[in-house]
Regions:
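HIT superfamily nucleotide-processing domains
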Residues: 1-107
Length: 107
């Protein structure tokens, strides 16, 4: 497993965690590999926070399958830093990928 800065970051500090063994899906990784992915993800998060002290939160994502937006056929976990004010209303987070599903809270 290893972490690296994304070549096309959507935000400063955007990083990836990637297994060395080829698997397309998180569900193809062994339980040991899944545990190691989380350990490396935690270490990468620490490095990202050292480099960008103004981070207010993170989105952590895996696009698993073409319908989910996977364009690289190799498992990678995306660590996307979020900054105060970077989106007018972040409520709903990744639910925004499906139109009309982000606002699930009732007044």
């Amino acid at each position: 497993m290893f972490g690296l800065w994304d070549s096309y970051p959507v935000a400063p500090g955007y990083a990836l965690v990637i297994p060395r063994r080829h698997v397309s899906s998180l569900f193809e990784a062994t339980s040991e590999e899944q545990a190691e992915l989380l350990e490396v993800l935690t270490a990468v998060r620490s490095k990202v926070l050292e480099a960008h002290s103004d981070i207010a939160g993170f989105n952590i994502g895996v696009n698993d399958g073409r319908a989910a937006g996977q364009t690289v056929n190799h498992l990678h976990i995306q660590l996307i830093p979020r900054y105060a004010g970077d989106h007018p209303d972040p409520t709903g987070g990744v639910r925004h990928v499906i139109p009309g599903k982000a606002n699930y809270l009732r007044a």
